[in-house]
C-alpha cells in the first residue's frame, strides 16, 4: 500500500487511491481494515497528490500545446491563456515541484531499506509541502480564472510572494526569477537593438499610441461663475499650463510606441518604464537611419556588449533588485540621451533650428512679415483659389529679398500653405494626421486668404524627433494668431497715417469719435502685441535656451521644449476659450474699423456714421468683457499671465477708471 501511495502522490492513481476530476485524489471507501485516523492521514496526503496532479496538468497544457495556438491569434483571445510568460511560469513551477519529486524518491529508498516505516513517517516527511502547494495553487487558479496574461503574470506572482511564509516566498521568487528571464530578453532586444519582440502582446511597451484614459467630467464642471461667460471648468483650466495633448510630441517619425501601463508590474515604476521606452525608440530611430544614411557608429557608442552583459547579470540574480535594475537602465539611457544631445545640439545645430522656428513661426523676423503683409495684403483679402498658394509664396520670397534675407538653404524649407475650398486631397491628408484645423471648419470655406494661411517647414533628420508634425501644427496655430495680431496692428498704424494726412483739415464730432476709437483700439492691440512678444515669447524662449545650454541630456531638452510650447499656447490664451474668443472679436472689430476708414477718407456720411456707432458699441462691449475676465481671474489669485496682460493694459488705472470699458463715448 505504501508503494500505491507513493505512485498516487507521483500522479498515478490506482485502485486504493482513486482520482475524481472534481474532488481529486481520495482513499477508496472499500477498505474496512483502515482505521478512520489512518484514512484521515491518507486523505491529508492525497491533497498533496491532488495539487501535484493539477500542477502537472497545467504545465503540460500550456507548454505542450501552446505552439499550436501560435498560428491562430484570433483564437487566442477566445481560447484562453497563451504566451511566453505563461511558458516561463510553467517552467518555474516545474522547477519548484522538483524537490517534491525528489522527496518521493527518497521515501521510496527509505521504505525499501526499512519496510516497517509507517504512514505517519510519509506524512511527516512531506509536511513541508502542506503549506507550499495550496499557496502556489491559489496563484495557478488565479492565472487560469482571470486569464492573466504577459507581464501581469509577473505582478500576480510578485504579490503572492510578499507573504510571511518562507517556503512559499522562496518558491514563488524562484518562479518569478524564471519569468524575469523572458522580460530581460525582451528588454535586451528593445533597449540594445530597438526590436520589439512581442508576438503575443505581453510586454509593457506596444506599438501605436497610448490608449489614453481621459476621464469625462460631467456637467458639474460647467457651473457659471458669472465672470463674463467664464465657467468653473474654464477657470480651473487657467491654472493648468499643461493643457496641450503631449501624446504625439513624443513620437518618432517612423513608428510610434507607447507604454501599456495596465500590465506594467507595480514594482517597476512608470518613470523607469518611460526611460526604457525612450531608449528603445531612440535606438530604433537611429538603426533605421543608419540603413538609409550609412552613418558610422552606434547610438550606444558600441557598448552593446557591455550593456548586454549587465542585463544578463541582472537576469542571473535570484531576486529582482529595483536599485540595480534602475541603475543599469539609467546607464543605458544616459548614454543614449547624451549621444542624442550631441547629435542634436552639436551636429544638427538645434539652437540654430530653434532660432529659425522663432524667426518664422513666432514672427521673430518682424521686418520680413511687415513686408509680407504689405505685399500680400490685396491678394489675401478675398477667398483663396487654386493659385493663391503659389502667389503667396512668390510674395513671401519677394519680401525676403526686400529685407535682405537671401539664405538659399533656408528658404526652400519654408512654404506658406493655403487651405481653400476644394482642396480635398490635402485637407483629407491633414485631417487624417492631425484632425481638423482650429482656425477654419472643414465644412465651410475660409472667408479670406488670411484665415486659410499657414506655414510648413521641412525638418531635417534627426530633429524630426523634436519637431514632429503635431508639434509643428501647434506652432502653426501660434503663427496664425501672432500674424493676425500683427496685421491688425499694421492696419491701425496705416489709419493713423491717414489721420495725420488730414489733421490740418477741419474735423467734426464724428471724426473725433473715429480717431479716439482708433486710439483706444491701437492702445489695446499694441499692449497685446507687446505682451505676446516680450512677456511670453522672449521670456519663454530665453528660458528654453538656458535649459538647453545647462544640460547634456536629450530627454531634458525634449521636456523643456514641450514645456515651452505648452506655455506659449497657454500664456497667449489660445487654450483659454473665453479670453481667446474675446480677443478675436476685438481683432475683427479693428479690421472692420480699418476697412471703414480706408474706404471713407473724408468725413463719414450717415451710413458710415451708423457703422461707426455699431463698431463703438461692439468694441466697448468686448473691451468691457475682457476687463471683467481679466479682473475676475486676478481676484481669484490664479494665472499670472492674465494678470500680466491686465497690468499692461491698466498700468495707469485708466482702464479701471473708465469702468473697464474702452471706446465708449457719446455719439
Swiss-Prot record:
Subunit structure of this chain's protein: Component of the gamma-tubulin ring complex (gTuRC) consisting of TUBGCP2, TUBGCP3, TUBGCP4, TUBGCP5 and TUBGCP6 and gamma-tubulin TUBG1 or TUBG2. TUBGCP2, TUBGCP3, TUBGCP4, TUBGCP5 and TUBGCP6 assemble in a 5:5:2:1:1 stoichiometry; each is associated with a gamma-tubulin, thereby arranging 14 gamma-tubulins in a helical manner. Gamma-tubulin at the first position is blocked by TUBGCP3 at the last position, allowing 13 protafilaments to grow into a microtubule.
Q: Which gene carries the instructions for this protein? A: TUBGCP4
Q: Which PANTHER family match?
A: GAMMA TUBULIN COMPLEX PROTEIN, GAMMA-TUBULIN COMPLEX COMPONENT 4
Supply the alphabetized keyword list.
Answer: Cytoplasm, Cytoskeleton, Intellectual disability, Microtubule, Primary microcephaly
Q: Which Pfam families match?
A: GCP_C_terminal, GCP_N_terminal
Task: Name the chain's protein.
Answer: Gamma-tubulin complex component 4
A GO MF term? gamma-tubulin binding
Q: What is its main location?
A: cytoplasm
**What tissues express this gene product?**
Ubiquitously expressed.
Q: Where in the cell is it found?
A: Cytoplasm, Cytoskeleton, Microtubule organizing center, Centrosome
Can you supply one Gene Ontology CC term for this chain's record?
microtubule cytoskeleton
Query: Where is the region Disordered?
Result: 425-445
Species the sequence originates in: Homo sapiens
Family note: Belongs to the TUBGCP family.
Superkingdom is Eukaryota
* A biological process term (GO) from this entry: cytoplasmic microtubule organization
Q: What is the lineage of its organism?
A: Eukaryota, Metazoa, Chordata, Craniata, Vertebrata
Amino acid at each position: 500500500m505504501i508503494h500505491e501511495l507513493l505512485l498516487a502522490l507521483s500522479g498515478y492513481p490506482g485502485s486504493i487511491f482513486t482520482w475524481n476530476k472534481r474532488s481529486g485524489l481520495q482513499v477508496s471507501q472499500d477498505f474496512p481494515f483502515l482505521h478512520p485516523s489512518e484514512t484521515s492521514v491518507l486523505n491529508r496526503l492525497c491533497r498533496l497528490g491532488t495539487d501535484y496532479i493539477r500542477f502537472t496538468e497545467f504545465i503540460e497544457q500550456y507548454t505542450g500545446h501552446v505552439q499550436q495556438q501560435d498560428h491562430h491569434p484570433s483564437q487566442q483571445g477566445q481560447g484562453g491563456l497563451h504566451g511566453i510568460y505563461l511558458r516561463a511560469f510553467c517552467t518555474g513551477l516545474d522547477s519548484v515541484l522538483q524537490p517534491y519529486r525528489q522527496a518521493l524518491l527518497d521515501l521510496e529508498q527509505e521504505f525499501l531499506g526499512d519496510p516497517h516505516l509507517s504512514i505517519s513517517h510519509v506524512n511527516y516527511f512531506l509536511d513541508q509541502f502542506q503549506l507550499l502547494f495550496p499557496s502556489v495553487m491559489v496563484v495557478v487558479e488565479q492565472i487560469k480564472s482571470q486569464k492573466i496574461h504577459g507581464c501581469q503574470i509577473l505582478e500576480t506572482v510578485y504579490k503572492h510572494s510578499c507573504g510571511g511564509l518562507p517556503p512559499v516566498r522562496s518558491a514563488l521568487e524562484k518562479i518569478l526569477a524564471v519569468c524575469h528571464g523572458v522580460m530581460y530578453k525582451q528588454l535586451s532586444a528593445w533597449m540594445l537593438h530597438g526590436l520589439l519582440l512581442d508576438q503575443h502582446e505581453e510586454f509593457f511597451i506596444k506599438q501605436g499610441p497610448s490608449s489614453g484614459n481621459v476621464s469625462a467630467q460631467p456637467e458639474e464642471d460647467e457651473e457659471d461663475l458669472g465672470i463674463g461667460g467664464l465657467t468653473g471648468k474654464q477657470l480651473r483650466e487657467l491654472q493648468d499650463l499643461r493643457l496641450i495633448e503631449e501624446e504625439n510630441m513624443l513620437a518618432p517619425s517612423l513608428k510610434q510606441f507607447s507604454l501599456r501601463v495596465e500590465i506594467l508590474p507595480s514594482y517597476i515604476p512608470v518613470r523607469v518604464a518611460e526611460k526604457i521606452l525612450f531608449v528603445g525608440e531612440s535606438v530604433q530611430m537611429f538603426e533605421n537611419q543608419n540603413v538609409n544614411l550609412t552613418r558610422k557608429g552606434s547610438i550606444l557608442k558600441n557598448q552593446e556588449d557591455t550593456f548586454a552583459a549587465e542585463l544578463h547579470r541582472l537576469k542571473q540574480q535570484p531576486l529582482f533588485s529595483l536599485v540595480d535594475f534602475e541603475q543599469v537602465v539609467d546607464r543605458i539611457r544616459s548614454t543614449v540621451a547624451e549621444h542624442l544631445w550631441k547629435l542634436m545640439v552639436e551636429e544638427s545645430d538645434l539652437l540654430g533650428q530653434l532660432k529659425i522656428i522663432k524667426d518664422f513661426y513666432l514672427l521673430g523676423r518682424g521686418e520680413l512679415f511687415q513686408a509680407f503683409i504689405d505685399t500680400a495684403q490685396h491678394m489675401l483679402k478675398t477667398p483663396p483659389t487654386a493659385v493663391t498658394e503659389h502667389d503667396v509664396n512668390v510674395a513671401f520670397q519677394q519680401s525676403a529679398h526686400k529685407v535682405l534675407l537671401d539664405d538659399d538653404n533656408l528658404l526652400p524649407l519654408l512654404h506658406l500653405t493655403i487651405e481653400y475650398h476644394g482642396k480635398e486631397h490635402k485637407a483629407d491628408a491633414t485631417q487624417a494626421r492631425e484632425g481638423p484645423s482650429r482656425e477654419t471648419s472643414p465644412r465651410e470655406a475660409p472667408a479670406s486668404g488670411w484665415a486659410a494661411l499657414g506655414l510648413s517647414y521641412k525638418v531635417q533628420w534627426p530633429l524630426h524627433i523634436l519637431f514632429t508634425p503635431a508639434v509643428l501644427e501647434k506652432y502653426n496655430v501660434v503663427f496664425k494668431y501672432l500674424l493676425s495680431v500683427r496685421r491688425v496692428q499694421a492696419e491701425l498704424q496705416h489709419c493713423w497715417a491717414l489721420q495725420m494726412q488730414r489733421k490740418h483739415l477741419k474735423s467734426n464730432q464724428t471724426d473725433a469719435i473715429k480717431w479716439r476709437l482708433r486710439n483706444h483700439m491701437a492702445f489695446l492691440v499694441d499692449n497685446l502685441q507687446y505682451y505676446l512678444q516680450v512677456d511670453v515669447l522672449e521670456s519663454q524662449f530665453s528660458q528654453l535656451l538656458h535649459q538647453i545650454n545647462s544640460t547634456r541630456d536629450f530627454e531634458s531638452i525634449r521636456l523643456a521644449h514641450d514645456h515651452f510650447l505648452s506655455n506659449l499656447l497657454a500664456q497667449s490664451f489660445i487654450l483659454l476659450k473665453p479670453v481667446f474668443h474675446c480677443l478675436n472679436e476685438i481683432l475683427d472689430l479693428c479690421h472692420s474699423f480699418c476697412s471703414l476708414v480706408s474706404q471713407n477718407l473724408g468725413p463719414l456720411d450717415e451710413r458710415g456714421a451708423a457703422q461707426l456707432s455699431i463698431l463703438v458699441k461692439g468694441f466697448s462691449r468686448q473691451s468691457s468683457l475682457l476687463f471683467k475676465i481679466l479682473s475676475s481671474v486676478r481676484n481669484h489669485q490664479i494665472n499670472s499671465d492674465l494678470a500680466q496682460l491686465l497690468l499692461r493694459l491698466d498700468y495707469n488705472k485708466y482702464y479701471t477708471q473708465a469702468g473697464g470699458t474702452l471706446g465708449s463715448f457719446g455719439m
